[in-house]
């Protein structure tokens, strides 16, 4: 463990009145880091063989388990359709962060350094950096587009960041529909984890229901 100086991007997004040009730069850096360091195709034979099973565990089995006591039957079916769609679109990569939202990215404006914090370190039953190419994008979507950290803090979303996220997805020719579906799914499945605040859970449910 080490002490790192800087400001969480979630705090900058929610509480600082920064020029749009600063956000353009920050989002460019985040996208470029993701594409440069968390995008290598997996070449390990054993991981390639077991990938379908692992991705099913991450996207489908986990979703079914967490959604069991939430939403109406019709809503759960719609959310699970998101899970099946995303799981079918995934491909294995060598390195995945696994929890890539703005509260896990530290930015030091003096040194212009970005630090990605608290990586998952597991994909299904597989320990390590192995993962899929959609999960980190979906995590960013559940925050930048659907406002995860704004919902947690109960403050207004940053609309410019939301629009900019879509703009950057288009610029990099990334699968917007799949990423947004994955982001909404991850927002839905994190609701049980926020058992300490029923009002927060309700805000998350409303966001999911309004976007199904």
What annotation goes with each model-predicted range?
Residues 9-58, 67-90, 171, 184-187:
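Conserved kinase catalytic-core helix
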Residues 174-183:
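All-alpha amphipathic helical-bundle segments outside canonical DNA-binding/catalytic cores
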